[in-house]
Amino acid sequence: MSFVLRVLVLIIPVSLIGLFFVLLSTENEYPGADYKIFEIPDFSLSNLNGTNKISNKDLEGDYLLNVWASWCITCMVEHPYLSKLSNNGIKIVGLNYKDDRSDALAWLNKFDNPYDLIIHDFKGTLALDLGVTGAPETFLVNNGKVV
C-alpha cells in the first residue's frame, strides 16, 4: 500500500471521530428553543361573555394559559385533551384569540368548556405581548410567570 493511501486510511477515520465529538459537544440551536421565564404582561381585557374586565392581577397561582379560537382547526383537535386536564383538576385559563365573541361562545357550547376563566383578546394585543405566533399555544404559568 502506498504511503499516501496509508495516511488517508488513518486520517479519514480520525477526522470523522473528531467531527463527531465536536458536533456532540456543541449546543443545539433551534429556532424558538431559547425559552425564557417572563412575567405575564399588564393587561385589562373583557371576559368572553363581555360582562367583566380581567387583568393580570386577577390571575393567581399555577395554571395553563391556552390560546385558542373557534376558527382554529388544530384547537379543535387539542380541545378534548384540555377537557381531560380540566376534569382532572388542572386550572386552565383560555385566551380567545382574534375571534368573534358569538362564534367562540357557540364553539364552547358545542365542544365543552374546559376553561376556569376566558379572556377575550379580539385584537390580539395580549397574545402579541406574550409572543404568540398562532393558535393554539399553551403556556405554563407559575405565580404570574410564564415558565
Residue ranges and their predicted role:
Residues M1-S44:
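N-terminal targeting signals for export/organelle localization
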Residues R6, K110-P114, D121-V147:
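Thiol/disulfide oxidoreductase modules built on the thioredoxin-like
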Residues K53-M76:
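Short active-site neighborhood of thiol/selenol oxidoreductases, capturing the structured segment around
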Residues L64-L65, I92, T138:
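Hydrophobic beta-strand anchors of alpha/beta hydrolase catalytic cores
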Residues M76-D112, F122-L128:
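Structural microenvironment flanking redox-active thiols in thiol-disulfide oxidoreductases
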